[in-house]
């Protein structure tokens, strides 16, 4: 359940965020909601590209796999609504009852038809225009005009996604900075080439231009090979190419790997003796003469001067992983598929040994799909495919990890014992940073993530020691999260750096800031930044020639992002020139930090440009993307106006964004939807340009949509964030309820029509808020893929915030969704979940349903999506999720839930 800047869409911020990909379109609708969902679906053809189901291709199946059925359970007892005084009375009562039902539904249908056919309104102002201070109203209400309403398909299908270019920075063979790796488009020019950033369009002759692959295909033994991914060697003489990719988990995959020689334009298998062996990871040596790779969970090395491959490990298998992470480390620690690190001189390979022997398995059932190549046994075709995952839940045994080393020259593996490290069963290795001269930095935490230790290991001497140790619980009662941005700074006496060092983020006076540690063994850093603001995923780039560090921070406000620079001695802190004061920027630097791809992401229409860094005298600028099409689109449709403010709850200022419908009229009463995520350290209220489901609800359904980043969320200081420790859901739900009560007092809000929804952690927060509120403030809620009991979620994420269940039994009880009586006080709520969710297991929803059944709670609906994982997209499910939300918000918006609340649960399986 990693959160951070990679998350762009609020509803797609899962406990592990669903990947931001385009989802399948939908061509069928739930029979229970057909009267509403098809009105929207029939009038707007989707533009979403297709997307395969998670790691599974459909096996033999009939039309049932393409449809979803909502089974209306009609197990009502007759004496609940029919007097038992004779058949004629029963018949008469039935007639009256169904006439009333027909009148209600007919009246609703007329009102709804009027609503969906009424003309939209156009706003001529940007949906994110105006001042962007976090305090008070900052955007102008929409100006009355005639314009189009945003179709649901467009809002969720990527039509409004800004065009964005990805730059693959690469270092030249002689250390040249500002080079790009480019692929030709449309078959013009060489397929793969290196280009100077100043000649990005390839229109000029440039000494730094290098053709790596002339064609997009090559042949090996008459087999036609079309590479899907490529990684040039550091000397740019060989290209590592991958074909036949198969997705595994979120970040991991396997494929066939090839070595392509740039000079001869020929290729060979990475392992000539096993050309069809599926490789899980391959990494170049910094000296370009070898490739380390993992296959079948064992680590190998291929020296380019030889066609033979040497096995570094041989006992890898089901429970032992070498050089790659297991599921929980991939998901919660590294956020990637790599656990192999070369030393900077190429003499050593550091790799993680992961032992899952004691980790319990969790079964994931697939009813309609199975992995490619899977064939069931004869006469077992009707049984589900069951995938067993080693998944450590809170309190269960974790995988044990150890850092191993391989001496390339001596061809031997070894380990280094370091005194005072944590015990195997209480250790997470969260970051490994290779340095020079055989030095390696290793960061480890205890499994509850409040003890942090940094070790320096010398592979040459085969010794190491702990150089830093912090108890975060004693500092502020909080936790530490895995870092992926710690940067090694090599010694350079001529540049004023007599010793090696590294830049890290640390807690300083209640905020996250940059610190420079030098020499490596020095536990006391030079603070590069200070103040009541925070750095974000820093540093972003380091110019070693000029001793300048670049980073992104919240110095202007917690909901803004700007690019800053500071000297390594802590002087000359300054914002990038010509930046808008209130804006949201991101940046990608070349390896030498001489050039940057600057990305303006809001609040106005996003743009991108390539520029030289302030420490580079080149003074280069190239507009890469202006999103003119998106700007034109925003002028053709009615978009809500955004109003940023803060609300004080218990002395804490909570960031808020309110989306008001076009032609907003303060004399009218509007229904309100609260949308939330709320996970620890996350942020949903920010200045990014974003058109999504929330935009659609405000623009086309006439709702006010409010998002509040309550306590526990990020970038407002440690006190704001860490207060939720040991008691997830308590303060967060309280903040949402208090904010909703404040909105209910506004003259333009109809407090009898207030709803709340969220996905993943947001689903948990939705249910926890409804449970705590017990119908007092919110009438309706929608929870997608929710956690309902933190004992069921993975250990690394959960214990970071909750400790182990053995050490916090009361906290786990309080954080579970268990008060079915309180939930029954709400008018109605909806739960949706994918049956094959490998992240937030379907077990969470099933156990909640059992609690509701035990107490006879009826005021909810349920939709299960077969074979969908946490992103819910198998067989068009993603669109169905939003159609169900649309259906129910339309009901609430027209006041029909007061009647609908008496219906028994609608469960869609």
Curated annotation (Swiss-Prot):
Its EC number is 3.4.14.5. The keyword Glycoprotein applies. It comes from the Eukaryota. It is found in: Vacuole membrane. Glycans are attached at residues 121, 207, 303, 355, 814, 819, 822, 888. GO terms for molecular function: aminopeptidase activity; dipeptidyl-peptidase activity; serine-type endopeptidase activity. Residues 1-63, 123-144 are annotated as: Disordered. InterPro entries: AB_hydrolase_fold, Pept_S9_AS, Peptidase_S9_cat, Peptidase_S9B_N, Serine_Prot_S9B/DPPIV. Residues 116-909 are vacuolar. Belongs to the peptidase S9B family. Type IV dipeptidyl-peptidase which removes N-terminal dipeptides sequentially from polypeptides having unsubstituted N-termini provided that the penultimate residue is proline. This is Probable dipeptidyl-aminopeptidase B. The lineage of its organism: Eukaryota, Fungi, Dikarya, Ascomycota, Pezizomycotina. The gene is DAPB.
